[in-house]
Amino acid sequence: MNLLTPEAWKALLSRYSHIVLVANSEAVDFERLRSELPETALYVFFNNVYKVLDEPFAGHAVLVARSGVMGANIVHRREVGDVLHFFAGDDFLGVINIRVSPEENFSEESRFNGAKARHLDLTQMLGDLYPQGKIATSGFAMALWLADLQLPGKILLAGFSAKRSEKWKVFDVHDWTFEQIFLRLFARMGSISMLGGVDASPYSALGKRFPNVPPIEIAMTAAEVLSERLHNANGQIDRLMSVTKSIRAIENFFRRFKPKTRKERYLEKTKK
C-alpha cells in the first residue's frame, strides 16, 4: 500500500492555492468555479465523476476512490476505465484510494489502470467522531482531513447540499444531518468555505431583528418549531406507510427472486 505521512501529504498539496472538493451533485456550477478560481486550484473528484463531467477535465485534478469490503468501488464494479478517461496529462495527480471504516479494504495500485495511486486510511480519525451505525461520506471525510492538514491554500466545498435530486439519490447509510451541521460550523469558523449559498444562515436576520434576545433563545425557538414540523411530517409518513403496505408486500415478494450481487456473493464466501 502506498500510504503517505501527514507531512508528505502536506508537501504534495501545499503547491495549490485552492483545494476544491466537487460533490457528485447537480448543484455544482462548473462554469462559475472555473471562472472565479485561478489555474492553481486543485479539483478533487469522487468515484463516478460522470455525474458532474461531460468531457475530459482540463486542469489540476485528483480522483478520490472510495473503498468497500471488496476494495475500491470503481475497481470491483469495473468502472476504472470509464472514470479515468476524464483525466490525463501531468495535471492529473492520480487516485487517492480511501477507507473510512474498518470493514473497507484498499485496492492495490496496479488495479487503477496505470494511474498513480496513493492510499489514505481515515478510520482512526472518524472512529470516535462519526455517529454510530452510520458511515461517513467520502466528501465529509476528505474535508475534515484536509482541514486538519492546515494547508496554506483555501479549502472549498462545491455542491455539498445533501439534497436528493430527480437524477441522483442520497444514501441513508450516511448521517447527512450530522455532516451538514459539522461542515457549516467548520465554514463559519473559517476552516473551509462552502459554495452554493449555504454559507449564510437563514436565521442570521433574526439576530439583527431581535438584538436583545440571546442567540440561545433564538436557537431554542427555532428547534421548537422544527420539532413540531418534524412531528407533523412523521404523522404523514406513517399514513403513507400504511397506504403503501400492500405495494411493499408485493415488492418484497419479488425481491426474493432477484439474483445476488457480486458483493453479496463475496460476503457469503468470506463468512464460510
Where are these regions (language model features)?
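Metal-ion/cofactor- or nucleotide/acyl-coenzyme-handling active-site neighborhoods
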Residues: 1-272
